[in-house]
């Protein structure tokens, strides 16, 4: 367990990622564009490196469509899979045998994790929080408030249409 933990520790340090380490677990954040930061926990176990990343809280609506979209995305991911916990919160999860823990493989794994956490974020919001986003948009426009952080949704908000995200 010492060698894989050291490989991970060295990787995080070399990439200027601040982390906390406790009892074989590493916690850190990966910066994104759509999702400002993805919280990640990596557990170094006796046989595997387990990676867990929080993507989004339990959607307010449209659960079946959100979960179906995530399951379809699982067919196209490298090393990571979408999962939900008992509260319905959405995660990306991965397992890597310790014998495969190298800086290059950690880079591929975390790259895949960030690509999918960040790249899916707006679609998950569109599918699972459209009503809340629409209310926020209307409230801000009525009061002359900035809608800058809602720009990704402007198209369907201005037309009054339902969001139609790209296929996975």
Show where each model-derived region lies.
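Amphipathic alpha-helical segments
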Residues: 1-18
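Short solvent-exposed loop/turn micro-motifs enriched in small/polar/acidic residues
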Residues: 12, 33-35, 74-76
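Short, surface-exposed charged micro-motifs
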Residues: 16-18, 39-41, 81-83
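Ser/Thr-rich, low-complexity intrinsically disordered terminal regions
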Residues: 20-38, 46-49
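Short, internal acidic amphipathic alpha-helical interface segments
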Residues: 52-93
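A generic structural motif
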Residues: 55-59, 96-105
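A contiguous, mid-protein "functional segment" used to position or interact
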Residues: 100-141
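Short, highly charged C-terminal tails/helix-capping segments
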Residues: 125-167
């Amino acid at each position: 367990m010492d060698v894989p933990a050291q490989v991970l520790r060295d990787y995080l340090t070399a990439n200027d990622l601040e982390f906390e380490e406790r009892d074989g677990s590493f916690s850190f954040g990966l910066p994104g564009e759509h999702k400002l930061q993805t919280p990640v926990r990596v557990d170094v176990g006796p046989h595997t490196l387990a990676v867990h990343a929080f993507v989004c809280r339990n959607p307010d609506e449209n659960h079946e469509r959100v979960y179906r979209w995530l399951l379809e995305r699982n067919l196209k991911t490298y090393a990571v899979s979408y999962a939900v916990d008992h509260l319905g919160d959405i995660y990306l999860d991965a397992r890597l045998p310790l014998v495969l823990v190298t800086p290059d493989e950690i880079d591929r794994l975390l790259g895949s994790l960030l690509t999918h956490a960040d790249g899916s974020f707006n679609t998950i919001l569109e599918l699972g929080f459209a009503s809340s986003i629409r209310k926020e948009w209307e409230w801000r426009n009525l009061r002359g408030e900035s809608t800058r952080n809602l720009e990704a949704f402007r198209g369907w908000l201005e037309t009054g249409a339902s969001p139609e995200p790209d296929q996975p």
